[in-house]
Amino acid sequence: MTSTNLEGTFPLIAKGKVRDIYQVDDNTLLFVATDRISAYDVIMSNGIPNKGKILTKLSEFWFDFLPIENHLIKGDIFQKYPQLEPYRNQLEGRSLLVRKLKLIPLEVIVRGYITGSGWKEYQKSKTVHGIPIGDVVESQQITPIFTPSTKAEQGEHDENITKEQADKIVGKELCDRIEKIAIDLYTKARDYAATKGIIIADTKFEFGLDGDNIVLVDEVLTPDSSRFWNAAKYEVGKSQDSYDKQFLRDWLTSNGVAGKDGVAMPEDIVTETKSKYVEAYENLTGDKWQE
């Protein structure tokens, strides 16, 4: 399912790369995770079956696990809002009812390993987001670092920024708090995942404000927002066997279509990507995935 239509029951106020967001009332939003998948800031023309359900269940797992206030409103959405019943087949298993908060306009990225764009920057300048890093090789573990980016509008590209630039956007005091919270959350999740055979190389958090409280929002530690590696096959100095979008990115790059609009994934790429998401879910939660 790559799009939703609630036929005006609630207004659609935003359509992200994956999520359709509906306004329930002044204080409440409905997040619906579709099966859309994006890579290199472009949405593929076809989706990954039930990917939205996997992301939703995994986010719920981490919301429960992590010791921080989050935006989730628990309960059966169809009991709370009977008018949604006709759309059960669109919403069930892939919807989260959440508090509407003031969003902090940063992509809060924490890196515990040098890979991806961080590795590319390091090769040029021995820095990651302007932070000097000692001598390392690809995929090497480092002390976790906060590497924010701008939160771009749909169709625009997020831009990597320094901590000092982030300070100017949200204020130094708030940015310092966000940095500490994000690194603490990453570290707790990383240590847990290690017991399940998964390395969390990096991840992206998003936060909102409820008064002065920093609240965890959006999705949390999913294969869409993180790099998950197979710990059993981890080998420093090379690219890793992963449970995330890297498989799709590699296919796009090798076929010369990275960043191009309207690309359709062949069935084998869809199937393999789905299996990686399912494996990540099952390893991290200990639960068997049920379609």
Swiss-Prot record:
EC numbers for this chain: 6.3.2.6
Pathway named in the protein's UniProt entry: Purine metabolism; IMP biosynthesis via de novo pathway; 5-amino-1-(5-phospho-D-ribosyl)imidazole-4-carboxamide from 5-amino-1-(5-phospho-D-ribosyl)imidazole-4-carboxylate: step 1/2
Broad enzyme group: ligase
CDD domains in alphabetical order: SAICAR_synt_Sc
Transmembrane segments: none
This protein's record includes keyword Magnesium: no
Xref: InterPro entries: SAICAR_synt/ADE2_N (IPR028923), SAICAR_synth (IPR001636), SAICAR_synthetase_CS (IPR018236)
GO biological process: 'de novo' IMP biosynthetic process
Keyword terms, alphabetized: ATP-binding, Ligase, Nucleotide-binding, Purine biosynthesis
Molecular function (Gene Ontology), one example: ATP binding
An example Gene Ontology CC term for this record: cytoplasm
Record bears the keyword ATP-binding: yes
Reaction catalyzed: 5-amino-1-(5-phospho-D-ribosyl)imidazole-4-carboxylate + L-aspartate + ATP = (2S)-2-[5-amino-1-(5-phospho-beta-D-ribosyl)imidazole-4-carboxamido]succinate + ADP + phosphate + 2 H(+)
Family: Belongs to the SAICAR synthetase family.
Name of the protein this chain belongs to: Phosphoribosylaminoimidazole-succinocarboxamide synthase
Species this protein is from: Candida maltosa (Yeast)
Organism phylogeny: Eukaryota, Fungi, Dikarya, Ascomycota, Saccharomycotina
